[in-house]
Design a protein with these regions (language model features):
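Short helix-coil boundary/hinge micro-motifs
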Residues: 1-131, 165
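Residues immediately within or flanking Cys/His clusters that coordinate Zn2+
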Residues: 120, 139, 144, 150
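Cys/His-rich short segments
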Residues: 126-127, 136-142
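Short, non-ligating residues that shape and space the ligands of small metal-coordination modules
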Residues: 132-133, 153
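Short beta->alpha connector loops at strand-helix junctions that form conserved
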Residues: 133-134, 145
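Basic DNA-binding region of bZIP-type proteins
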Residues: 145-164
Length: 165
């Protein structure tokens, strides 16, 4: 995976889910999931399972941005979550023998409970996961410098063409 700073990083540990979802760059057709698997000690034979989870999470995050529902993605994550075991150790809930994909699921489920999940979204333009820091949760771009600027420039040009006609 590339060494990069996310324009709008999620707080830890949700940032790990954000990095996992961003293990593909659709705009430049780059696949970083094999590196993610290696970095987290998983064999390459887990690629299909990891890619399916990543795309299910991406679909759920896209809904945060555009509305609607993603029933197939929800069903996939629910099924994958059944394999994640937690234990109570004293006052703390911990994962019991979960692999890194199980940890991604557990963090996502925890974020759903603590309210941070709905702030993690997928950019309408480039499909990059970003954390919405706006007060009213209305952010729709990964960053103003990247997609926001592109889309505003495109809209401006469209308006100018319409006014000139």
């Amino acid at each position: 995976m590339p060494n990069y700073d996310l324009p709008n990083p999620a707080p830890e540990p949700l940032r790990g889910v954000q990095l996992f979802v961003n293990s593909i760059d659709r705009e430049h057709d780059r696949e970083w999931l094999p590196g993610w698997l290696e970095e987290h000690g998983l064999p390459q034979s887990e690629f299909d399972r990891a890619a399916a989870l990543r795309e299910a999470l991406r679909a759920l995050l896209y809904v945060h941005n555009v509305g609607g529902a993603a029933p197939e993605a929800s069903a996939y994550v629910n099924e994958a979550a059944r394999a994640v075991r937690v234990e109570l150790r004293g006052e703390e809930v911990v994962l019991a023998g979960a692999d890194p994909l199980g940890e991604v699921i557990a963090v996502a489920l925890t974020a759903m409970l603590d309210g941070t999940w709905k702030r993690l979204k997928v950019c309408r333009n480039c499909q990059w996961a970003f954390y919405d820091t706006s007060k009213n949760r209305s952010g729709s771009w990964c960053s103003m410098q990247l997609c926001g600027n592109r889309l505003k420039t495109r809209a401006y040009r469209t308006r100018r063409r319409g006014a000139a006609a």
